[in-house]
């Protein structure tokens, strides 16, 4: 693994997607925030509209270095990490996190990792169930304005704190989100235990920090359904994925993939301090 600093891999100042559990286990608060990487084990999160984070609250921050990138190869060769941390200090518009655990991926390999002494991955004894099938009978009209946004960030309900991952996606004009993965992945297993999730589309393919601080993004929350291969919608969506992301044609055509439909309950606005 590399000896490079986290900021060398990700960048010193990036956009992040932060997720934390609310007062109830079934609630998740999700923010788009600025991130200053202070060290390999410390982040400063910046919230232009304020936040509701508290000292000692566990927060997961998705980090990657894809700002300004709109094309990828099949191995997704960008540095990316699901940074799990603890809030150590706050102001009205900022919060500092101390790292609990993270792994930085590049392609399919781990380039850098950290975990505090004594950390163990939390056991998850929630039962897995088959996802309900999507009610769609035909592919919806897709949102062409999101064509430059090749990948977004999926936040799922893991034990203790959320899990984040980047996903190639399609979005409809009705805020449906579609994504594809293998059923053996950690995110797929989490969805089989709780099919609620959040999906953030942050526009970082065309983002610069010099632009207006009110960043162009949306956060979709809802329930995930499976689109079975027997459904007439499956090949329609599959072809649309290949058109949007031809660099992943081999993956989208793999016989073992599972296709998911996030049916939006609402578009989540950024959490603000009241």
Per-range role (PLM):
Residues 1-274:
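Binding-site signature for planar aromatic cofactors or substrates
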